[in-house]
């Protein structure tokens, strides 16, 4: 008799994805982030669900309802901070996951990579709308500034912004619809993640060498299930350290002031995980140009398979490309720092140089480094 795990229609799917899946024998801890992102998503949906039970999406009561959750609801404070800091952990895992894909050439799995880029955009949209919900000063002004960027679109811009606002400014209608979207999007993300996994399992995982691992596979369970559990424990440890010891470390103090349309905060800035893109947006003195650079800074990931000029897939044996990759990482950290600084000298010029460097590295320097390596190896 066949094992139910292999014959039952539902169990069979789980079995083929998480138990009997043939996996490369040499995938490193950089391959842990996929499962960690899944855990982050489940955690965010669960904490978000419990927050939604007590939250009210009305401009008059939104801020007070969040305060009520923290003060009066049993363990409401920990649920709220797990949700807020869970978003930070989510983005740390996301950026590590994307970085791994860039370093090891995983973007050659076209469908998986493109779904991944769509997922990245969706998660960013969800996080942005979630940040608006507590209706603090930074929530309100962040929503105003970012939605206003759409007015840079020629001809339809202004109408589009007012349509998104549901009025002539960010108000009740905006908050209500943002709450609705923020609630529904994680489920869309979960569906997209399943498609992401479906496409990945068509090809099998990449590995650090970038060479086909068909000749050397091991079952996912127990080898990678235990490895994923270790990763999950470390993730939860890091998250709970943040939540219990420094819950407001990554937040903005301005968001503890209720939203006031009549008073603009001195420095409007998004959460830390958007600062690199915000720095690129601010570095261009033209509104439409800035918006285009902002979108392209993420959309450029779609071009990665086209920009791959090396004869090797992974950067494991390519020192020059490794050098370029880590310069790109340093550049992104510089942009993140600049995004949180005021718009004044010398930050403006540093931001502009870092923005130029970002696009130059991806579009010119990295493909050139790959070609030089090909020539050095006489390929």
Curated annotation (Swiss-Prot):
The chain crosses the membrane at residues 33-53, 77-98, 113-133, 178-198, 226-246, 288-308, 320-340, 347-367. It comes from the Eukaryota. Its main location: mitochondrion. It is found in: Mitochondrion inner membrane. Heme b b566 binds at residues 97, 196. The keyword Ion transport does not apply. Keywords: Electron transport, Heme, Iron, Membrane, Metal-binding, Mitochondrion, Mitochondrion inner membrane, Respiratory chain, Transmembrane, Transmembrane helix, Transport, Ubiquinone. One of its GO terms (cellular component) is mitochondrial inner membrane. Heme b b562 binds at residues 83, 182. SUPFAM superfamilies: a domain/subunit of cytochrome bc1 complex (Ubiquinol-cytochrome c reductase), Transmembrane di-heme cytochromes. Component of the ubiquinol-cytochrome c reductase complex (complex III or cytochrome b-c1 complex) that is part of the mitochondrial respiratory chain. The b-c1 complex mediates electron transfer from ubiquinol to cytochrome c. Contributes to the generation of a proton gradient across the mitochondrial membrane that is then used for ATP synthesis. Heme 1 (or BL or b562) is low-potential and absorbs at about 562 nm, and heme 2 (or BH or b566) is high-potential and absorbs at about 566 nm. Belongs to the cytochrome b family. This is Cytochrome b. The gene is MT-CYB.
